[in-house]
C-alpha cells in the first residue's frame, strides 16, 4: 500500500536524522578548517593572524560565523534526535533498510574534530571583527562601501542574529515608552530629539547610530515578512499534507466497511434527492421535446438507478472529506501554536514592525483603513458577507446549516467587533494621533 510505503519512508528519514545532522556539522567544521589552512596558516580565523586587509578579514570572519552557527544548530538537532532515536549500535555498523548507519567510533571521531574546531572560537569572537576594525573604516560613509562589505555585514548579521534581535527588542521598548502621554505632544518631543541628534557635535557616533538604526530596521522588516509568511505557509502546508497522506486514508479505511454511511447530515440528503428529481424530470422533458429518444419506464428506471449510484458515491465522499477537514484543521492549529510558542522573539519584532507601519501612516490613510475595515466587517452590507462565511464553514466541516445560529451570530458578533474598534479609537488612537480621529469623523460624516 502507498500508505505503508510512505510511513516506511518517514520512519527511515527519522532514523537517519542524527547521522544526517552530525554529517552536516562535520562538513561545516571541515569548511572552517579549510579556511584556516588556506588563508591563516592553520591558525584561528582572526585579524591578528591574517595578512589581509580589514575588508577581507571581515569576509572570512563572517564565513566562519555562518559555519559556527550551522554547527551549533546541527549539534542541537543531533542531541535531540539521538535521545529519541537509538541509531548507533555498539561499535559495529548496522544496516537499516539498506542504509549503513555510522558507528560509535566514527561518531566520536567526528565530535572530537568538531570540538577541536569550535574550541578556538569563544563567545567574544562574535564581536571581534567590529572591535579590531580601524576607526577610519568604521567612520566611512554608507554610500562609499563596496558590495563585498555589504555582503560580509549581511552574513555577519545572520550569524549573530540573536544579538541584533536583542537590540531591536530593546529599541522597541524604548519606542513604546515614548508613546506614553506627557506634558508636551509626542510629535513635538520627537522633532526636538531629531534636531538635537542632527546638531550633535560627536558626528562619528551619530553616523554610526544612524547606520546601525538603518540595519536594524532593514533586518526587522526582513524577519517580520519571513515570520508572517511562515505563519501562513506552515498551517496551510500542515493541513494539506496531513489531510492527503494521513487523515483521508485512515477515514476511508474506517468507513470502507460501513456501506450504510452516505449522508453526513440532512442538508446533503435533501440536496441529493433534489438533484435526483431534477435528473428524472430532465429525462422526461428531453424525451417529450425530441432532444433525446423517448425511453420506456424500465429504461428511465435504469437511468435513475445509475444516477442514484453516482450521487451516493459523490455525497459519501463529500461527507468523508468533511470529516477529514476537521482533523486536518486541528493539526493545522497545533502547527500554528507550535510556531507561535517557539517564536516569541519574532513576535516582538513583528509587533514593532506593524506598529511602525501603522503609526507612520498619514492621518487620511489611517482614517481610510479604519473606514474600510468597519464597512467590510461591521458596516451596512456586512451581514451578507458573514452569512456567506458561515455557510462556507458549515459545508467545510459537514455541519447542517442552522439559520437561527447564523442570524444570532450576525446580530451579536459585528456589534461586539464595532464596540472593540470604537474603544480602541477612543482609548489609544485618540491619544496617539488625534488628527487621525478628527479626519476619520469628517470622512465618516
Swiss-Prot record:
Function of the protein: Required for H(+) efflux immediately after light irradiation to form a rapid H(+) concentration gradient across the thylakoid membranes. Together with PxcL, contributes to transient H(+) uptake following dark to light transition.
Cell inner membrane recorded as keyword: yes
Superkingdom classification of source: Bacteria
Compartment annotation: Cell inner membrane
One Gene Ontology term of the molecular function aspect: proton transmembrane transporter activity
Topology term for the membrane: Multi-pass membrane protein
Keyword set includes Methyltransferase: no
Transmembrane segments: 227-247, 322-342, 369-389, 405-425
Family: Belongs to the CemA family.
GO cellular component: plasma membrane
NCBIfam families registered for this protein in UniProt: PRK02507.1-1
Protein name: Proton extrusion protein PxcA
Keywords, ordered alphabetically: Cell inner membrane, Cell membrane, Hydrogen ion transport, Ion transport, Membrane, Transmembrane, Transmembrane helix, Transport
One family name in Pfam for this protein: CemA
Amino acid at each position: 500500500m502507498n500508505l505503508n510505503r510512505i510511513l516506511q519512508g518517514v520512519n527511515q528519514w527519522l532514523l537517519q536524522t542524527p547521522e544526517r545532522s552530525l554529517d552536516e556539522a562535520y562538513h561545516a567544521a571541515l569548511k572552517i578548517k579549510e579556511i584556516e589552512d588556506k588563508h591563516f596558516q592553520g591558525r584561528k580565523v582572526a585579524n591578528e593572524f591574517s595578512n589581509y586587509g580589514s575588508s577581507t578579514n571581515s569576509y572570512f570572519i563572517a564565513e566562519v560565523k555562518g559555519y559556527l552557527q550551522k554547527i551549533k544548530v546541527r549539534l542541537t538537532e543531533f542531541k535531540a534526535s539521538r535521545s529519541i532515536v537509538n541509531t548507533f549500535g555498539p561499535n559495529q555498523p548496522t544496516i537499516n533498510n539498506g542504509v549503513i548507519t555510522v558507528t560509535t567510533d566514527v561518531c566520536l571521531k567526528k565530535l572530537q574534530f568538531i570540538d577541536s574546531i569550535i574550541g578556538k572560537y569563544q563567545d567574544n569572537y562574535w564581536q571581534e571583527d567590529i572591535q579590531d576594525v580601524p576607526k577610519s573604516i568604521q567612520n566611512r560613509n554608507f554610500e562609499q562601501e563596496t558590495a563585498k562589505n555589504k555582503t560580509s555585514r549581511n552574513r555577519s548579521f545572520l550569524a549573530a542574529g540573536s544579538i541584533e534581535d536583542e537590540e531591536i527588542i530593546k529599541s522597541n521598548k524604548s519606542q513604546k515608552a515614548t508613546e506614553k502621554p506627557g506634558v508636551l505632544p509626542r510629535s513635538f518631543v520627537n522633532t526636538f530629539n531629531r534636531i538635537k541628534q542632527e546638531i550633535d557635535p560627536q558626528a562619528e557616533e551619530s553616523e554610526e547610530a544612524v547606520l546601525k538604526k538603518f540595519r536594524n530596521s532593514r533586518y526587522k522588516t526582513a524577519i517580520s515578512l519571513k515570520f508572517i509568511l511562515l505563519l501562513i505557509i506552515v498551517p496551510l502546508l500542515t493541513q494539506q499534507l496531513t489531510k492527503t497522506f494521513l487523515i483521508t486514508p485512515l477515514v476511508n479505511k474506517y468507513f470502507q466497511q460501513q456501506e450504510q454511511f452516505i449522508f453526513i447530515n440532512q442538508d446533503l440528503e435533501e440536496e441529493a434527492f433534489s438533484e435526483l428529481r431534477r435528473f428524472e424530470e430532465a429525462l422526461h422533458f428531453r424525451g417529450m421535446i425530441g432532444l433525446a429518444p423517448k425511453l420506456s419506464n424500465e429504461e428511465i428506471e435504469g437511468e435513475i438507478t445509475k444516477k442514484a449510484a453516482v450521487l451516493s458515491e459523490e455525497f459519501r465522499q463529500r461527507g468523508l472529506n468533511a470529516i477529514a477537514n476537521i482533523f486536518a484543521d486541528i493539526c493545522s492549529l497545533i502547527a500554528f501554536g507550535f510556531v507561535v510558542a517557539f517564536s516569541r522573539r519574532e513576535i516582538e519584532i513583528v509587533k514593532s514592525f506593524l506598529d511602525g507601519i501603522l503609526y507612520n501612516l498619514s492621518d487620511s490613510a489611517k482614517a481610510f483603513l479604519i473606514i474600510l475595515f468597519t464597512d467590510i466587517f461591521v458596516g451596512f452590507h456586512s451581514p451578507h458577507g458573514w452569512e456567506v462565511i458561515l455557510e462556507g464553514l458549515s459545508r467545510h466541516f459537514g455541519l447542517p446549516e442552522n439559520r437561527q445560529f447564523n442570524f444570532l451570530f450576525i446580530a451579536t458578533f459585528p456589534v461586539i467587533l464595532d464596540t472593540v474598534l470604537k474603544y480602541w479609537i477612543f482609548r489609544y488612537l485618540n491619544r496617539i494621533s488625534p488628527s487621525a480621529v478628527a479626519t476619520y469623523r469628517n470622512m465618516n460624516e
